[in-house]
Structure formats: structure tokens, C-alpha cells
Amino acid sequence: MNWICLLIFAFFSIAAVVKDIRELMIPDWTIIAGSAALLAYQALFARGLIVQGLLGAALSPLLFYAVRRITNFGMGLGDVKYSILCGLCAGANLAFLSYAAASLICALYFASKYLLDKKTGKKNGRKAKIPFAPFMAAGIIAVCAIDRASSFV
């Protein structure tokens, strides 16, 4: 992973994240165009990243599909597909650490939201829909940025 890959990922993730927050849907074009842009960049300028990227893109949806099945389709198919773009950006070596970070960020956000709602008397059911793409994007960007920054030290 390098900074250019991270910028390409962030560019295409903005639309995915905004749409997921607003409508709980991730547009396929963001995944297809983002993946094509990342693959083109890696093939032309960063050949050393392509194997890890393809491995991450192949393994990530398997993990998210398993989560989708285990949770009785609680996770949307858009998140499963979006994991392809995430895996392609981070590579297999960083993708799963990024997903752990995404889950932690999500848990902290919703725990604080729950406590705030409890304090204000607002009621939200346990079945509330969660847009997970923002947390996936945050996890990928955080872990990849830390990885790149640590290479300068």
C-alpha cells in the first residue's frame, strides 16, 4: 500500500460512505470504478502491491459473506462487495487488521451513542440498521496511514 493507493481508495469511498449513511446502500459503480483505478495504478506504477491487493480483494468478501450468513443477513451485500475495494487497497496483510479497527471504531461509536440516547431518554431498538462502510473506510485509512507513516521512522 502506498499513499497514491490510499488517495484513490479515499476518492471512491467518499461516494460509497455518503450513500451508505443516507440510504444504507453502496453504489456498485464506486466499487467497480475504484477497483479498476486501483488495479490500473498498481499494474502500471506499483507492481509490488498487486499480489497482496488481489489476495486482499479475494479474501475480504469471503470474510464479510461469512459474517453476513452468521448474522442471518444482518450485514448488507453492499458491505460484502465494498470489502473488495478495501482489500484491494490495503492488501491481505493489512486488510484484516483494518477490519478489526473498523469494528472497534463502530463499537465505540455505537456504545457512546447508546449511552447518550439512554441519558436523553431516546429509544433506539437493537435492530437499528448500521451503515458499516464509513467504519470500514475509517479502518482502512487509519491502519494504512499508520503503516505508511511508520515506514518513515
What are these regions (language model features)?
Residues 1-153:
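A membrane-topology feature that recognizes alpha-helical transmembrane segments
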